[in-house]
């Protein structure tokens, strides 16, 4: 009879997972990772909890996560309560002054605090900010102004969040920012995350979405492209393989990579713990686009 202690299959799997993760933990310790949090992962309670635990774990092993969020579903709920009709053009919310008041209230006053509380509850040390705080983000009017108070990023100054990261805090940033006159603007959270990642010289930009990643055939989830170069990503847009709502997300990744971010990831936030699966495993789970610095 063997006197060696028995290990069950789940025990062995846990050890294998930890062993596989160790080189990635060592590699990314002290590196900055900007995470755009949105989609189903904000709506379903089980997915919210998984994201909070993933982000808190990243911070606990020495990675420096920054969370940027939108809050579309809750904004729509409040607009409906106030009898304000949500209007969209080309995927962007038309934002009149009344709508802007609701957007700011929901993103800064409600969603941001919910995320901060959720991260703190699972052991993180989160701090809530908006683009206005410390002059973090300055906005400018998007396009010709026909969408109202919809903005683009004019400037990013990450100096307010660097000391927070140095002290082990997790900055949580809502995508509302003022222009040079102090007028608040509603900015797409993907855009804010990408520009912030570039300004911070981040290791990674991660977009949590409601799709598996970039697909060669948008109707076939099995056609997931797990890795692309910067030039290949541009070619897929030009060829129409990347289309619809995936175009602005891919373009956001391309802009960030062109400004020095080493890798950008488009992940399925509907998969529990997709963040950890992508960052700390060999196979990953979504699409990774590599910048020229990473390829070199």
Curated annotation (Swiss-Prot):
The answer to whether keyword Kinase applies is yes
Functional pathway: Amino-acid biosynthesis; L-arginine biosynthesis; N(2)-acetyl-L-ornithine from L-glutamate: step 2/4
**Pfam families in the record:** AA_kinase
Q: Where substrate is bound, by residue?
A: 71-72, 93, 186
Localization in the cell: Cytoplasm
Q: What class of enzyme is it?
A: transferase
**Entry-linked CDD domains:** AAK_NAGK-C
GO BP terms, alphabetized: arginine biosynthetic process via ornithine; L-arginine biosynthetic process
Can you list the GO cellular component terms from the UniProt entry? cytoplasm
Chief place where the protein resides: cytoplasm
Q: Transferase: is it a keyword of this entry? A: yes
Reactions catalysed, semicolon-separated, are:
N-acetyl-L-glutamate + ATP = N-acetyl-L-glutamyl 5-phosphate + ADP
Q: Family per UniProt? A: Belongs to the acetylglutamate kinase family. ArgB subfamily.
Protein name as annotated: Acetylglutamate kinase
Taxonomic classification: Bacteria, Bacillati, Cyanobacteriota, Cyanophyceae, Synechococcales
